[in-house]
């Protein structure tokens, strides 16, 4: 995926959106729930705050992601 495609997918995420992604440094598929999306801001890359089953990832930047997809288009009310 291109960086533009990754950011476009990230921008569709809201709190509770379930996603899966592959990071550049590994080939493992990760799954988690989005906590918040932060758009690109000047020199700062767009990023997501994500909750995985075993950990919280406060910054998952677009440049770290190789491939991302939304598992569902609905979000869950917390």
Model regions: which residues?
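Mixed-charge, Lys/Arg-rich low-complexity intrinsically disordered regions
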Residues: 1-18
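Intrinsically disordered, low-complexity, charged/polar segments
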Residues: 3, 48-78
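Residue-level detector of intrinsically disordered/flexible regions characterized by low predicted structural confidence
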Residues: 5, 20-22, 69
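Intrinsically disordered, low-complexity cationic segments
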Residues: 11, 29, 74-75
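Generic surface-pattern signal
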Residues: 12-15, 39, 70
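Basic/aromatic-rich interaction segments and small domains that mediate binding to polyanionic partners
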Residues: 18, 22-62
